[in-house]
A protein has these predicted regions:
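Short, surface-exposed coil-to-beta transition loops
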Residues: 58-60, 121-122, 142-148
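Beta-strand/loop substructures that line and gate deep hydrophobic ligand-binding cavities in soluble
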Residues: 35, 42, 139-199
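Short, highly charged C-terminal tails/helix-capping segments
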Residues: 98, 196-216
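Membrane-penetrating hydrophobic segments
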Residues: 1-12
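A short, structured loop/turn motif at beta-sheet edges
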Residues: 66-70, 128-132, 149-159, 199-206
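Hydrophobic ligand-binding cavity/cleft-lining segments
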Residues: 16-109, 123, 215-216
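Short, hydrophobic/aromatic-rich segments at coil-to-beta transitions
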Residues: 107-110, 128-137
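Short, charged/polar surface micro-motifs in flexible loops or helix N-caps
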Residues: 81-82, 129-133, 143
């Protein structure tokens, strides 16, 4: 009897796990992959989308920033561990060092091949860019792309869009744990980073507007 009870509990656990996975794939993952982005932004083609086809990871997130591209761009090109930070959860993604609210002149140069540290041991690099418009990051093996894209709405507002695309195999036991962690942890960190860029760029825009008003 006790053995049958254990079997029944195991069956219930398996069913619950399967239901959770189904709910995640059906409802949570589509929202996670498109947080803040409009249907048009999700379906739009961006630079280097043709780097590879049918990626397993294809996430497009966006936020509206009350600032011009030139007020947002400086905060993007200085991102990185030990640099400006990730404007997110500093205790986790910047070694406990607070992300800066300022534009750092020493990190305002950008060129193809420039590294952006993810941690003390890993980094992505700039694969290509168009000044004040977009910046593409690549991994060392060129397996994935990470695009930052600035789309002006009007004279004082810009859509900040990020698109991440990657290939991986769910059947690979060596990669699966990392991908599960990425699936569950990426959105909170990406959302926090986008909102961090937004807050800093809008602060800069307010300061510049006040200075212009005082000077005028």
């Amino acid at each position: 009897m006790r053995k049958l009870h254990k079997v029944a509990l195991a069956a219930v656990a398996v069913e619950a796990a399967a239901a959770s996975v189904w709910a995640y794939v059906k409802w949570v993952r589509p929202w996670q992959m498109t947080w803040g982005a409009t249907p048009e932004e999700v379906s739009r083609e961006y630079p280097y989308d043709d780097a590879f086809e049918h990626p397993e990871w294809n996430a497009t997130r966006a936020v509206t920033v009350a600032a011009r591209p030139e007020q947002i761009w400086p905060f993007l090109i200085q991102i990185g561990w030990g640099r400006a930070g990730w404007y997110g959860y500093d205790s986790v993604d910047n070694g406990g060092r607070p992300s800066t609210w300022e534009v750092l002149p020493e990190h305002q140069w950008l060129e193809v091949g420039k590294d952006f540290p993810m941690s003390p041991f890993t980094a992505v690099y700039c694969g290509d860019f168009e000044e004040l418009r977009w910046m593409l990051w690549r991994t060392g093996g060129d397996a994935g792309t990470w695009l930052w894209y600035l789309d002006p709405i009007d004279d004082t507002h810009t859509r900040l869009i990020t698109r991440m695309r990657d290939h991986y195999k769910w059947t690979n036991p060596l990669i699966l744990p990392q991908q599960i962690l990425t699936e569950l942890g990426d959105l909170p960190f990406m959302r926090k980073c986008l909102l961090g860029v937004k807050a800093r760029a809008e602060r800069l825009a307010r300061v510049e507007a006040q200075q212009a008003a005082a000077g005028g």
